[in-house]
Amino acid sequence: LEAIIRANEVEEVWFSYSDVAHQYVMTAASRVMAAGAHFGVCSAERTMLKSTKPLVAITAVRTGVGKSQTTRYVSRILKDMGKRVVAIRHPMPYGDLAAQACQRFATYEDLDLHKCTIEEREEYEPHIDNGFIVYAGVDYEMILREAEKEADVILWDGGNNDMSFYKADLYLTLLDPHRAGHELSYYPGMVNLLLADLLIVNKMDTAPAEGVAEVIAN
């Protein structure tokens, strides 16, 4: 890192990774600053696109908390209210990124057409099984505009503990009592904690009581 900064006279370094401890971020920042460059992290507000449709974002403080299951639960509630729901999934692109700019999945044939990986299929298939359309890809402005054409409500199905790519009318953040305290010590999970309109403590049927209490207290 230091060699690249010095060899190329780099002036700014932007941290573009997620689900890492705050200590990790500041260690990287210290190395960058000592090498002579500015260090930055991206603002939530300035990186979010605005939809013309109501949008619900499902995020978390850590990866593996249960975002996708929650997205499917919320989508069923909205469907029962008579709303047309389209999910937009956090990107997992591999291969030819230009060809994957905007992907629409409504059937299993669409998954084959786009040569989805096993990881991608695991995320998309439950939505399809429940009768919902899923968008994903690379160009999230294009994806949003296409999704708006066939949705009354859009659901952001987040990945890792990344911030939503879109400005949400309702921002949901999941907390994990099996990893109590991480909601205050992981980036950008704590950003999601602070942005949330609604906090959900997941896995309460299996978590220790002290973990649940700590998460709620935090």
List each model region and its residues:
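Short, acidic/small-residue loops that bind anionic groups at enzyme active sites
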Residues: 33-49, 177-184
